[in-house]
């Protein structure tokens, strides 16, 4: 009987009738999370967290373990799919004013930080050339912290350089953090259901709600099928599309790659980091590139929640999307003109969105309500 009540609660959950496909990305993220946890568990069974054996153990998984190549490729492609979904999920939140549900937005931003940390630790685990050098560059940023920077870095490394203790603790963190993500996701969903979802119009949905099942469950199943089909097509035809050639060589501390870069989903933050020719300034900008999302609920000035009827803000939003893509592209290029200038200009544009948004909201209020 209690199970039936739980099922009824899920089935009869009232949801606004006009929410679009952009609201399906939450369930897609939940599926990605489940997929990553399952594939990650099976990979962890065969992985060895040792600097001499890590690279060989990954090769062993793909070559010798039954269906190991599926697990390894699904885990790698799943990470990229996770970030594609989360960036679209955040973009939808910015466009439709979902950030005004403060608790949900703030818990979601904390989730993003933990997710990025988890993905970074996971990128180091294969102990390839790019894994090692990306870890060296990014962890070295801690030395920019005044007074305690060097101590913090040595504490994280477990010594005076990246070595076996570093890999062991990164593996431990990469294993434990997904469970933190699952716990926080539960809180995120619980907080969402106390107030309910917004909708494309930004109005109150109470006047027109429909049951979650069958309407939205069928919508969810459709997008999940598309996502999983895409993942399997990539896995079978071009499994290494998101990988860098340098990472197919074992880590060598004596040979520095020509161009050090993290995975594609961190390139926007990496582009902002390297556009500032100062270590501390770059590190602060790197953290702010994500932390600035925390400010949006407190800087909203428009009388309208959604951007649906706000053409000026829409223009600024699509500029932000173009800026995000341009920073990502520029960060893949060497640190030389014109890429440094492009990186600096796009970084400036990226942060200007969060300054212009409240100003444009105020201006649109003036224009819209002049004659009322």
Swiss-Prot record:
It is a multi-pass membrane protein. The keyword Membrane applies. Its cofactor is heme b. One of its GO terms (cellular component) is respiratory chain complex III. Heme b b566 binds at residues 89, 188. Pfam families: Cytochrom_B_C, Cytochrome_B. Belongs to the cytochrome b family. Heme 1 (or BL or b562) is low-potential and absorbs at about 562 nm, and heme 2 (or BH or b566) is high-potential and absorbs at about 566 nm. This is Cytochrome b. It comes from Lycodon semicarinatus (Ryukyu odd-tooth snake). The lineage of its organism: Eukaryota, Metazoa, Chordata, Craniata, Vertebrata. The gene is MT-CYB.
């Amino acid at each position: 009987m209690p199970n039936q009540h739980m099922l009824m609660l899920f089935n009869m959950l009232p949801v606004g009738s006009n929410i679009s496909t952009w609201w399906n990305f939450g369930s897609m993220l939940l599926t990605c999370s489940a997929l990553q946890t399952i594939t990650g568990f099976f990979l962890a069974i065969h992985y060895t967290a040792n600097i001499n054996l890590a690279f060989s153990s990954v090769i062993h998984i793909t070559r010798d373990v039954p269906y190991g190549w599926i697990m390894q490729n699904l885990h790698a492609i799943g990470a990229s799919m996770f970030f594609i979904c989360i960036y679209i999920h955040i973009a939808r939140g910015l466009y439709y004013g979902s950030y005004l549900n403060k608790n949900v937005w703030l818990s979601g931003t904390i989730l993003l930080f933990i997710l990025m940390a988890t993905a970074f630790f996971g990128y180091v685990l294969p102990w390839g050339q790019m894994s090692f050098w990306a870890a060296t560059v990014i962890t070295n940023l801690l030395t920019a912290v005044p007074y305690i920077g060097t101590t913090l870095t040595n504490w994280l490394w477990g010594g005076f350089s990246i070595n076996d203790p570093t890999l062991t603790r990164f593996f431990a963190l990469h294993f434990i953090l997904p469970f933190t993500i699952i716990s926080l996701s539960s809180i995120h969903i619980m907080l969402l259901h106390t107030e309910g979802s917004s909708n494309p119009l930004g109005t109150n949905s109470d006047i027109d709600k429909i049951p979650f099942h069958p309407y939205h469950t069928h919508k969810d199943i459709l997008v999940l099928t598309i996502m999983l089909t895409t993942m399997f097509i990539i896995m079978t035809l071009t499994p290494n599309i998101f990988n860098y050639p340098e990472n197919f060589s074992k880590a060598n501390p004596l040979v520095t790659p020509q161009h050090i870069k993290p995975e594609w989903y961190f390139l926007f933050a990496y582009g902002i980091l390297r556009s500032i020719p100062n270590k501390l300034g770059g590190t602060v900008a790197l953290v702010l590139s994500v932390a600035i999302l925390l400010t949006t609920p407190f800087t909203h000035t428009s009388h309208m929640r959604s951007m649906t009827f706000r053409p000026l803000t829409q223009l600024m939003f699509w500029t932000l999307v173009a800026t995000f893509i341009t920073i990502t592209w520029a960060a893949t290029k060497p640190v030389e003109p014109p890429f440094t200038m492009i990186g600096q200009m796009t970084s400036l544009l990226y942060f200007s969105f969060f300054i212009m948004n409240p100003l444009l909201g105020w201006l649109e209020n003036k224009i819209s309500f002049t004659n009322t």
